[in-house]
């Protein structure tokens, strides 16, 4: 019996959630990382009070107000919303103000798309108002359908269908003998950030780019179209930015790297590097169908074909297209609303929470569905302050402006306050839209254990289990489509924490994580709110209250999840970072890089063998001719040993720190220990910065994080260990070798910092 109880004790320490529940989501008895027993119990009680406050009725009314009119950058209602948010922050007791930045925000003055041959056709480029949708008729205030930061252009040329417009699609076109030089390409939305499509098209010699919403992706293939169902109607169009942010930087194109304040030195428009090289225009599938139907040439590969009732040909031509776009290149104000609750013990350590308030049109789902949760969190925290709660650290709530054009408000704020943030910012927590379904968690892996712990304390409104358990079971259900479902299901059932997603870009955490190196989380619910109204006039209160989180219970769950996270981070005696999962994840990235290289080596060896054997000639269909692929050199061996050694060192330090924290927990509240916690927490705040490099990534110095970055040719999608991974993908093998050395050095520095933190803890406990 003694050994049995020893085993039980061990598992309660390692996997506490398996043995102690959350007392029906009241005050849990599970120990909190970074808290002494007494402080942990007090924190649990305050958190329970907090989670009882958010009210779905308030969320609904906030959304009705904030999405009542179009509120894009430069609009009257955008400023009105900022002032409304400011007034509410102040009413709730927060110290709040607006910070204004002046940014380049183009709006269209000319949009023309017409087919000149073989038949005449002029695209509507309009989204019609719907009688049942009260705000869809606000035409005078709506932004037209366009892609921001497209260059002005007036071009004529043959049309070529390029699937999703990614580099691998152009490789297939090469095999078909199709060139896009001098052509206008038409690409489908999705499978990458939209700005990648004109970037790759221009690199291949195209003179213009159209992007359309394919019904197979977000239209009638999935469900009824709006207003009968949630999907994109035939005339629905996805607006959006095509700024080349991943290659250059997000934020104002005229003030890269510095805040867009009135006295900032601005580039001339012609010198702005993130504007597209060719004109771009988004269109509906209603406008795309006649253009695609007029194409001839080879049939598109089967996987390229969509669900429009036409044969999908590649071209070029005989469709000849005229595209003309011109813009008002104006400087417009953005209004960031910043609110603060001062810390009582460590006011110089900041926990920052943000969501944007601007939309492309009415923007109920994106972004107001999560902005309302942020507001209800702020109201609830203000209520706790009035009841006597005093956060240990300073809490900063941010309602960003200008996110949609490309993270303007948050980037300019971070660039303006970069030195302060490097000194004071502990964690940034982001949301950007919320729906109904399963909690998704992304972020810095030093926070993986922390956010898993929070998720175990929140009730899912539909199933009444924890949002953590629902996320776990959903991942188990989805594992059947994985390459190794058995191994994945085993990990999901046995690993103490669910793996959180690495972060690329696409929302307001980007400058915090990728530029300054602030540990970050990005959270939201979704999966049961499929829809096709993204960035259209139909993303409004009517759509959201009919097809998404109609009772706003998931808006409340988001407020409970994020607000609990904010409180737990703000109140912890020791910031609840854990580095064991970071080390484990980094080692996983190393193994994936080695496999990526090995797979690429074998792929090229096999292709060269097939060329030698004459396989391509033997299998050529003369009625469907293709071009043989070019012979390539097999990639060289890369030495991953420095990275492996660095990860092993990081693992040892992480375990040492974890052990030291466990041994010191009971004495964290002692005066002698408390006096030394400031130095320890400063080391922990520094830990994410150690994973950055002041010189940045190759050819994009604004991006400084060596573990996470948006992909140059994927955009929002993350590239982990980006310098090495993209070096391999882009066949820059010498550069990849150099990046292995840089990453290894950063990991060694991280290991040394964590080892120092462990010794600080051990010294404090003596």
Model-derived segments and spans:
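C-terminal amphipathic alpha-helical interaction region
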Residues: 666-766
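Soluble metallo-hydrolase cores and metallopeptidase-like ectodomains found primarily
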Residues: 137-172, 248-365, 379, 383-387
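His/Asp/Glu-rich mid-to-C-terminal helical/loop segments that flank catalytic regions of hydrolases
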Residues: 396, 457, 514, 524, ...
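A conserved hydrophobic secondary-structure block that centers on an alpha-helix together
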Residues: 159-231, 344-350, 360, 375-376, ...
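Alpha-helical metal-binding/catalytic segments enriched in His/Glu/Asp
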Residues: 215, 337, 353-407, 412, ...
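Metal-dependent peptidase/peptidase-like ectodomains
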Residues: 233-299, 346, 402-545, 571-572, ...
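Noncatalytic luminal/extracellular "stalk/propeptide" segments of secretory-pathway proteins
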Residues: 32-45, 64-179, 184, 215, ...
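Second-shell loop/turn segments in exported
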Residues: 45-53, 67-76, 145-150, 184-191, ...
């Amino acid at each position: 019996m003694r050994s049995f109880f020893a085993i039980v004790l061990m598992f309660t320490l390692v996997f506490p959630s398996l043995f102690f529940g959350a007392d029906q989501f009241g005050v849990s008895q599970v120990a909190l990382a970074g808290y002494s027993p007494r402080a942990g119990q007090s924190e649990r009680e305050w958190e329970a009070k907090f989670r009882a406050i958010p009210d779905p009725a308030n969320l609904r009314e906030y959304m009705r107000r904030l999405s009542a009119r179009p509120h894009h950058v430069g609009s009257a209602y955008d400023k009105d919303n900022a002032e409304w948010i400011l007034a509410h922050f102040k009413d709730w007791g927060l110290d709040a103000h607006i910070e204004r930045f002046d940014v380049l925000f183009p709006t269209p003055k000319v949009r023309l798309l017409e087919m000149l041959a073989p038949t005449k056709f002029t695209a509507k480029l309009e989204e019609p108002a719907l009688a049942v949708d009260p705000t869809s008729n606000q035409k005078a205030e709506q932004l037209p359908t366009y892609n921001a930061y497209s260059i002005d252009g007036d071009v004529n040329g043959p049309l070529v269908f390029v699937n999703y417009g990614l580099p691998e699609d152009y490789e297939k076109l090469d095999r078909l003998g199709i060139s896009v030089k001098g052509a206008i390409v038409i690409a489908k939305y999705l499978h990458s950030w939209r700005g990648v499509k004109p970037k790759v098209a221009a690199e291949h010699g195209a003179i213009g780019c159209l992007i359309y919403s394919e019904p197979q992706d977000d239209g009638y293939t999935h469900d009824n179209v709006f207003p009968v169902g949630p999907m994109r109607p035939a005339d629905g169009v996805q607006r959006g930015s095509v700024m080349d942010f991943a290659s250059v930087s997000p934020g104002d194109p005229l003030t890269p790297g510095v805040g867009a304040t009135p006295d900032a030195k601005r580039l001339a428009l012609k010198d702005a590097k993130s504007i597209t090289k060719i004109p771009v225009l988004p269109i509906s599938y209603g406008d795309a169908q006649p253009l695609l139907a007029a194409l001839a040439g080879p049939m598109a590969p089967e996987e390229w074909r969509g669900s429009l009732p036409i044969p999908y040909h590649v071209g070029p031509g005989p469709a000849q297209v005229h595209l003309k776009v011109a813009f008002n290149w104006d400087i417009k104000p953005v209004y960031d609303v910043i609110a603060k609750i001062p810390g009582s013990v460590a006011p110089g350590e900041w926990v920052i929470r943000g969501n944007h308030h601007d939309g492309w049109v009415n923007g109920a789902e994106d972004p107001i569905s999560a902005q309302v949760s942020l507001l209800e969190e702020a109201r609830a925290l203000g209520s706790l302050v009035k009841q006597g709660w005093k956060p240990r650290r300073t809490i900063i709530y941010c309602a960003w402006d200008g996110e949609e054009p490309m993270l303007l408000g948050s980037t300019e704020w971070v660039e303006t306050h970069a030195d302060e943030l490097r000194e004071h910012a502990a964690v940034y927590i982001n949301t950007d839209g919320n729906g109904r379904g399963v909690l998704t968690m992304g972020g810095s892996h030093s926070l993986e254990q922390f956010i898993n712990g929070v998720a175990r304390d929140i009730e899912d409104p539909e199933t009444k289990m924890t949002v953590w358990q629902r996320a776990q079971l959903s991942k188990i259900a989805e594992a059947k489509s994985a390459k190794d479902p058995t191994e994945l299901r085993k990990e999901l059932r046995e690993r103490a924490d669910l793996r959180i997603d690495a972060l690329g870009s696409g929302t307001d955490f980007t400058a915090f994580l990728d530029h300054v190196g602030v540990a970050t989380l990005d959270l939201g619910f979704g999966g049961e709110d499929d829809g096709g109204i993204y960035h259209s006039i139909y993303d409004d209160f009517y759509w959201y209250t009919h097809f998404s989180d109609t009772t706003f219970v998931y808006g409340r769950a988001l407020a409970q999840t994020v607000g609990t996270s904010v409180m737990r981070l703000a109140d912890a005696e020791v910031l609840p970072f854990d580095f064991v999962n970071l080390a484990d994840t980094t080692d996983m990235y190393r193994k994936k890089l080695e496999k990526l290289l090995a797979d690429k080596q074998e792929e090229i060896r096999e292709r060269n063998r097939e060329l030698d054997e004459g396989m391509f000639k033997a299998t050529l269909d003369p009625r469907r001719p293709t071009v043989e692929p070019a012979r390539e050199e097999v990639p060289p061996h890369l030495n991953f040993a420095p990275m492996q050694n660095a990860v092993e060192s990081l693992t040892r330090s992480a375990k040492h720190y974890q052990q030291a924290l466990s041994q010191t927990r009971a004495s964290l509240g002692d005066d002698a220990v408390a006096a030394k916690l400031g130095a320890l927490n400063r080391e922990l705040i520094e830990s994410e910065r150690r994973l950055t490099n002041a010189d940045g990534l190759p050819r994009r110095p604004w991006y400084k994080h060596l573990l996470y970055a948006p992909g140059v040719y994927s955009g929002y999608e993350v590239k982990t260990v980006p310098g090495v991974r993209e070096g391999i993908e882009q066949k820059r093998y010498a550069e990849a070798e150099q990046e292995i050395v840089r990453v290894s050095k950063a990991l060694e520095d991280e290991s040394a910092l964590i080892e120092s933190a462990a010794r600080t803890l051990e010294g404090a406990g003596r």
